[in-house]
Structure formats: structure tokens, C-alpha cells
């Protein structure tokens, strides 16, 4: 049995862990294409598609700015080629680089634990390691009523690879994946029908943001909320129908399942290594990334409560330090974790939501609409808002939530302020805010907070 100083299962954020110092031999195991979900089937390709939909939406809005433009053609194949030619090249380059690293052995196959710090690759190649890191990511959840229906469906893993654009898509789910793909395909001219069990889309987000986005979504998509799917069936020669508990049916040409994600931990043989899992399937780790088995660590979607690539990367950097400095362990940086949804309009969030604060602690709130700023006038924006929560006594930010144009950029100075402990008053008046830039939305929201 070949032995390594370090074995890493997963080539997404796990790839960050490979030490530059070739003091020991490293095994890197990947069951699929090199690079992980974010690069191949997740955040990166979907955001390139989303920007294409943004451009299409701008064209449709051109008349409101006195411009005579119209969207006359959508070349789906050209859009796909633009996305995947870049993605596939990055994946191939990454694989080639790792395979060519002297102290790294790349195993292309599925790893399974056979004992403490022992693995077998594709049930053929046994290896062992002093330390093993599980970074296997996550995959889409498919409810049994759909999985067992016999009806063709797509998930985020495969929807971007469809050969042609359908006339309509039925999306089961109302979270960030559902919202982003609804934006992508509606922007390209596809009729969207959404079905969600929750009373609002993006339910885990701040209530005010979730309610506002739901109202906006209903203006352009056929949205069915508090809806329970009872059956999925074929409808005619090529269509599908989703039957709901209230007796209605939602029909379309293609079915996209965006009902959440689950960690890729169920077929790793973790019990053979003494690694415990939580009820939701995530590997149980402490604040340093250690599992319940000595010498075995985990990061990213396999164990983290945050299904976010920037969190997985931060955990990987922390874990790289911990592996190199066992006497000086650092905790995972899980404070002030921001997130964004690249739908239309964008949504960005960090910190406490209104439902976290009401009845639990003192707070003050302020909301600034985009329409109350000069750049908001330029955008003709009547929907965008920035909502902030702060502690009235300490003057520190508690939470920030933005819905609107470039929300993912506008949230960043608020993330920085919260992360460094900068007070609201100092942030608002301790620096210049460029006039009449869109950042005045944030400035004005800060100034509206009534502090003691």
C-alpha cells in the first residue's frame, strides 16, 4: 500500500491545500472533472450566463432611456461556447499543473475509507496517509416524487448543457439557485414557472428582502408559493406537468429541480474511519476543521454550514495553516460571511436579518431606496433598496441587506466595516463617498440610522 503524508479528496477548494513545499508526498483524489463544482457546474459558469441575461435585459429596457434597440436573436450555442471554452481550459490547465507537480500524485477515481486514514480508489488502488482532508463538496437534492417519476429533469449540474432553449421551464424550488436560473433563462426569452413550498422566494434571507424579491418575481414569472408537488408526469409528446396538492397543474417544456443541495459524504465509507456525520449529512467538525477521527479533517460543503465558494476557500487557507502548524491552530473564519444572489435585481447580504433581531436584542434600522440617489435616477431604478441594522448603543453594524443593481459590489464596504469593527458613524463620515456614485445608497442608509 502506497503511503502519503497528506491525502486530499476533492480538487475544488481542496486543491488550495496542496503545499508548495515538497517536503512530503501528497495524494489528490478527484472522482470527476478537475476543479470542483464552482468552476465546472456552479458559481463561475452560472455567473457568466447571468451576465449575458443582464445584457439582454438592458437591451429590452433601452426604450426607457430614449434608445431604439431590440433583442432580435439569442444564439444559445454561441453563449454556451463562450462559457465552456473558458471553463474547460481552466479545468484542463489545473489538472495538467497538478499532474505535473513532482510531489503530487493525482488519482482520478472515487475514494472510499477502508479504515483509519486508509482509502481505496475505485475499489482497486489502496493508499494510506498521515492526514486526510475530505473536501468532496455537495450535489443537488432531487425529491423522491420527481426522482421516481420517470420524467426527464435537469438540475444545476446539467441545465447549462441543454442543446437548445425551450419555450418554457418549470422550476421546482425557490432558493438562490432557482432564482438565478429563472433570471438566466427568462432573460433569454424563456417563460418561467416557479413552484416553491415556502410562502416566499428566498425565504432564508431577510424578510423584507425576501418579500420584495417575491413581489418583483411575480411581475415577470408565473410563481406558485406554499405549493406541494404531488406528482410529476409527461404532458403530450415533449412537455411535462407538475401536479400540486391544490389540484392544479403547472406545465412546461423542461423541468429544472433546484430544491437545495446535500453534502457528498454518503458514499465515502466514513464509518470505517470513525468519522461522524450530522443529521443533514455534513461531516462533523470542530472550529479548526478536525473531524471525530484523529488525522482526518474536512472543509467546504462536505462539512460547512455555508454552501459558498469563498467560505470553502477561506476554510482551505485556514486548514492549510493548521496542517502546517499543529501547535498553533486557527479557527475557521465564520464571522461576517457575505452572500449574493445573481438574479435580477441582484441581492447581497451579510450579518443579522430582521428575524434574527426582533424580540431578541435592541437594534435600529434604516432603509435607503436607490430612487433616492442621483445614480438611482440615472438607472431609472424604482425597486432597489439598502437596509441596515445597527446596535443603538455601540454604533456597530449588525446586518446589511441590499436588493438592486450591483448589490454584490455595494455590500463589500459594509462587509469590511463589520469585519474590522468600524462603527456606523465613522464609516458614514470618516471617509469620502464619491458623488454621484451608486455607493451613495450605502452612505445615505448609514446616515439614516438613529444611534444613541
Q: How would you name each of these model-derived features?
A:
Residues 2-33, 37, 44, 48-58, ...:
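Flexible, glycine-rich terminal cap/loop adjacent to redox cofactors
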Residues 7-9, 111, 126-137, 171-172, ...:
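Short hydrophobic core segments
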Residues 2-4, 122-131, 245-254, 265, ...:
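Core beta-strand elements of the Rossmann-like FAD/NAD(P) dinucleotide-binding domain
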Residues 105, 112-120, 188-287:
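A Rossmann-like FAD-binding core segment of flavoenzymes
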Amino acid at each position: 500500500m502506497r503511503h502519503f503524508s497528506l491525502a486530499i479528496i476533492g480538487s475544488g477548494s481542496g486543491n488550495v491545500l496542496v503545499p508548495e513545499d515538497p517536503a512530503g508526498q501528497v495524494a489528490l483524489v478527484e472522482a470527476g472533472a478537475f476543479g470542483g463544482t464552482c468552476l465546472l457546474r456552479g458559481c463561475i459558469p452560472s455567473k457568466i450566463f447571468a451576465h449575458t441575461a443582464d445584457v439582454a435585459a438592458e437591451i429590452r429596457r433601452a426604450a426607457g432611456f430614449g434608445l431604439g434597440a431590440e433583442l432580435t436573436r439569442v444564439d444559445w450555442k454561441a453563449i454556451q461556447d463562450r462559457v465552456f471554452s473558458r471553463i474547460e481550459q481552466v479545468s484542463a490547465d489545473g489538472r495538467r499543473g497538478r499532474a505535473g507537480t513532482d510531489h503530487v500524485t493525482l488519482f482520478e477515481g472515487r475514494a472510499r475509507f477502508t479504515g483509519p486514514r486508509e482509502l481505496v480508489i475505485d475499489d482497486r488502488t489502496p493508499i494510506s496517509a498521515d492526514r486526510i482532508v475530505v473536501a468532496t463538496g455537495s450535489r443537488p437534492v432531487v425529491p423522491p416524487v420527481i426522482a421516481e417519476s420517470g420524467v426527464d429533469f435537469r438540475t444545476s449540474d446539467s441545465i447549462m448543457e441543454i442543446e437548445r432553449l425551450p419555450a418554457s421551464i418549470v422550476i421546482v424550488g425557490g432558493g438562490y439557485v432557482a432564482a438565478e436560473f429563472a433570471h438566466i433563462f427568462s432573460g433569454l426569452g424563456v417563460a418561467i414557472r416557479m413552484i416553491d413550498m415556502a410562502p416566499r422566494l428566498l425565504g432564508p434571507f431577510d424578510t423584507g428582502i425576501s418579500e420584495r424579491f417575491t413581489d418583483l418575481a411575480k411581475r415577470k414569472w408565473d410563481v406558485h408559493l406554499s405549493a406541494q408537488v404531488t406528482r410529476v408526469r409527461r404532458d403530450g409528446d415533449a412537455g411535462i406537468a407538475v401536479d400540486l396538492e391544490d389540484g392544479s397543474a403547472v406545465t412546461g417544456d423542461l423541468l429544472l429541480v433546484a430544491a437545495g443541495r446535500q453534502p457528498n459524504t454518503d458514499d465515502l465509507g466514513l464509518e470505517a474511519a470513525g468519522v461522524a456525520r450530522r443529521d443533514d449529512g455534513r461531516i462533523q467538525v470542530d472550529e479548526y476543521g478536525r473531524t471525530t477521527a484523529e488525522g482526518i479533517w474536512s472543509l467546504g460543503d462536505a462539512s460547512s454550514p455555508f454552501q459558498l465558494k469563498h467560505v470553502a476557500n477561506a476554510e482551505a487557507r485556514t486548514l492549510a495553516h493548521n496542517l502546517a502548524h499543529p501547535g498553533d491552530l486557527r479557527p475557521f473564519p465564520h464571522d461576517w460571511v457575505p452572500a449574493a444572489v445573481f438574479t435580477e435585481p441582484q441581492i447581497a447580504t451579510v450579518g443579522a436579518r430582521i428575524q434574527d433581531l426582533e424580540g431578541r436584542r435592541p437594534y435600529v434600522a434604516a432603509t435607503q431606496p436607490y430612487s433616492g440617489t442621483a445614480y438611482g435616477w440615472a438607472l431609472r431604478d424604482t425597486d432597489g433598496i439598502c437596509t441596515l441594522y445597527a446596535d443603538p448603543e455601540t454604533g456597530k453594524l449588525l446586518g446589511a441587506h441590499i436588493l438592486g443593481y450591483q448589490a454584490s459590489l455595494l455590500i463589500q464596504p459594509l462587509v469590511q466595516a463589520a469585519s474590522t469593527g468600524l462603527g456606523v458613524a465613522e464609516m458614514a463620515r470618516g471617509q469620502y463617498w464619491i458623488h454621484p456614485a451608486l455607493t451613495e445608497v450605502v452612505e445615505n442608509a448609514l446616515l439614516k440610522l438613529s444611534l444613541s
